[in-house]
Amino acid sequence: MKTYMNGGGSKVLFDYSDIRPKGAMLVTSGGKAPGPQPLKECLVKIEGMLREKENGTQLTTLEAHDIVCHIADAVLAGGIRRAALISLFNADDDQMISCKSGNWWETNPQRGRANNSACLMRHKITKEFFLDLWERVEKSGAGFFVSSIGTRAKEISKEVSMNK
């Protein structure tokens, strides 16, 4: 990333010659090699995202998340996806909370590679904040919570479930 962003206009070149050609048999796992194409497509998508950034402009958490998801899309063995992701983010990160809302599977299918979880700090959670977050997660149909200290999120969650 540093080379690309701070390279002074230098083009980053990749050598794909050591990647097994498409269709080569995989002895250990079975199946056939996908060849270099999935990696090439991944790098083109990531380069497109980076080009949209002004030199030195920081990536948003969602942009970083999408880059990792594109990389996961490129991880294939025998034609089968071999990557699993979990993205942990601040519970007040609106972009990450809503990244699987709407028709994301059509506009950003790479996001399907990740389990997205909001990190909650026990001493900072209010019932109102949790309920708002819970409602947003229910609407998107995706996402979980990770309580980094204690079980306050679980306590509130149980209370919410019992009051429905």
Describe these PLM feature segments:
Residues 1-18, 25-28, 32-164:
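Conserved catalytic cores of very large enzyme subunits
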